[in-house]
Every structure is written in structure tokens, then in C-alpha cells.
Amino acid sequence: MGLSVKTGTVVWNERKELLTPDETNTTLLYNTNVTNDNKIKLTKFKNDEKQQYINMEGSTDPIIVVNRGNGNAKYTFKYALIEKFAPYVVENHLNMIYPTTSMDKKKLTKVFKQVIQSFENPKTREFIALFFGNNGLSKTELETILPIYV
């Protein structure tokens, strides 16, 4: 499909000095920003040290983010398409699906649509429940084990 997976690179509590409430900075996407209906919703956190924005260079490339899980709670399979988004970086509790080959916008949209349709397939949730149980979904598992139903 011309896609690969990597884990978000920002560990927010190791970058506290770069966090800011200033919306003119880069958006830091957390797994808690992914809603149950698989959209992104920015938020104000209860923990004052945790902020939605960060003073770092970001990307505007389209990706799909997938919840990795926290290790201390029941795993919930959630994902969201990130496109037409302000510059962003991704926190380490999310995996990112991104293109590894050059694709025009039309082709990339088609490929991402196939992935999302597969994620919406009831077989995907059934597979996750059987194979992963309450454990999180690693980069390697997402890339090599989770089936994409086309």
C-alpha cells in the first residue's frame, strides 16, 4: 500500500519547558485528543503542566494516528485522519501511519480511505479483541500483524 508506521516522537513530560497554551504554536496531538468517533478534538487538560501546544517545528503532512494505549488502562482502538491540519507533532501514545512513497493527493486519499474502511470493518475490532485483548497496539503490530481488509 506504500505506507509505514512509526510511533509519535514527543514525550510530553520530558518536554515540559516547550509546552504552551499559545495556539499560535505547533499542535501536540495526544491519544486523548482522538475521540470515540475517530475525530480529533483539542482540549484543555486538567493537569496544568500538560498543554495542547508546543514550541517545536511541526508537520502538515496527512497521516492517520492510531491509539497505542497507555499500559495502565483497558485498550481502546481509536484512530483519526489528520489532513488539512495546522502544523502538528505527535505524542508517543499514538502511532502514525504515513506514506513511504511519493503519492499525489488523490492517490493518498484513496489509500487512507481503504485503511479507514478496514478499521471500520467489524472484523478489525474482532481481531483486536482476540489477538491483543486489553494490551496496547505497538507500531510493529499495527504495521505487520493487524490485517487491512480491502
Put a short name on every predicted segment:
Residues M1-V150:
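Polybasic, glycine- and aromatic-enriched phosphate-binding surface used to engage nucleic acids
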